[in-house]
């Protein structure tokens, strides 16, 4: 057959409903049943084919449909600042091991912007897109380091449990505040924390009480001193480059990093608007 991967990209709204049944709702139910039968039949004919379900509208990210898909992505071209908010929110609907999150890397992006989208990839199954062939050596160095850390964190994402911390974000299209997403492995021996700061008036630090523990830092991904000092607050533009250029330092000094207090309280020094950091923890 020659096929190893198939993507069903469905980005339509429901409109006024579905014709041909007693009601629009019944018509929709029949359409969903037929779609489920299609996916189930495909799995029988091509049992080794990986199936991705893509639905920016969201109505294909539904449990009865997701059981037929190996992966589901809410968008393959999401470059707006609400990316980490949507990805974290979908932990309530889609198993994280199935939740595809696209990190779109642009050649004009500075270190802060690259970290923002790469960190969002740690909220699901990270997929890279964008200007990959044109990235500089420094940009690829950061991306490779993120991928290496992601490989270590994969078991936590696959079988863990998610905890949300941070103030309520009232407008996702123009987000203000911050979020810390804590994912604890099933055996409670490792944990992954993904921090994102948005716009508005930001605190100097964001912190949370970690479940379980005590914990120690295994590895982290954060900004260099140069990038961390570039923007200390306010509402810097998050799109798409957000900075002066792509030629940042290849080696991270991680000044805008996480600190553990007493092994259970995690403190993140927020470097500025639309920034991010990731840390992998292990039990002490």
Sequence positions of predicted segments:
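C-terminal beta-strand-rich structural cap/linker in extracellular carbohydrate-active enzymes
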Residues: 257-284
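Structural motif
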Residues: 106-118, 184-187
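Hydrophobic, well-ordered secondary-structure elements that form the walls
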Residues: 9, 51, 121, 193, ...
